[in-house]
Amino acid sequence: MLRAAWRALSSIRTQAVTQPPVLGLPGGGCAKLLSVQRDLPSSLILQAARGYATQKPVQQSQEDDPPPSMLLKDYQNVPGIEKVDDVVKRLISLEMANKKEMLKIKKEQLMSKVVENPKDTSSLEAQIVALTVKIRSYEEHMQKHQKDKAHKRYLLMSIDKRQKMLKNLRKTNYPVFEKTCKELGIEYTFPPPYHRKIHRRLATKKALCIRVFQEVQKLKKQKRALKTAAAAAQKQGQRNPESPSEARSEAIKETQ
């Protein structure tokens, strides 16, 4: 009995070694022994089997981002700020600032590059700068939370709005448009021309509409002819009284 059990176990091991490679594993790896698979943690086996081990590259920060050691705007002009301890400087720097303050500083930096008057917020180029900062913030958020449908919708809506503003700025002031695109590092793409594919249903519907229009015009013309004939017959009846049916038949013959 023991010898038979040992032979069965040895045959199972030889089958596991000579097993062909499994196509589901990434990299075309071969199936290992059951003992080796048991030694591995279950999370690694699931990741390899389901293909979840691949990670997307994280988006790098923009070149125009301020350094994290930069102080906040409210503390930059404070006298004696250079003598403050490093821990305090870190607390009032951009490294510990919230998202709203970071976006505000990025917006001010881009405004100083693009807009002549930094306090101007109503011009097209200023609105484009504000939308660009918002779009980059949405892109960073989408890199971390790829299933956030609400922010994805906000991102697409902001891109469409900026595209429309760039189109208007290009029509009104082309030099400012070039400067804005160059400083912000964006590229304006022309919208595709409208093209509707002609098919049999559309052609048949158009022909039917033309035919109906012609028939309606023909009926209107006949009604006008009958009215004029009736008016003429009424005038003649006052002079020479006749039956109205005979006058109407004569008018129809004249129109035909």
UniProtKB/Swiss-Prot annotation:
GO molecular function: structural constituent of ribosome
Alphabetized SMART domains for the sequence: Ribosomal_S15 (SM01387)
Family annotation (CDD domains): Ribosomal_S15p_S13e (cd00353)
Pfam families for this protein: Ribosomal_S15 (PF00312)
Location in or out of the cell: Mitochondrion matrix
TM stretches of this protein: none
Basic and acidic residues bias: start-end ranges: 245-256
Record key words, sorted: Mitochondrion, Ribonucleoprotein, Ribosomal protein, Transit peptide
Organelle targeting sequence: 1-53
Protein family (similarity comment): Belongs to the universal ribosomal protein uS15 family.
Cited HAMAP family: Ribosomal_uS15_B
Subunit structure: Component of the mitochondrial ribosome small subunit (28S) which comprises a 12S rRNA and about 30 distinct proteins. Interacts with METTL17.
Full protein name: Small ribosomal subunit protein uS15m
Gene: MRPS15
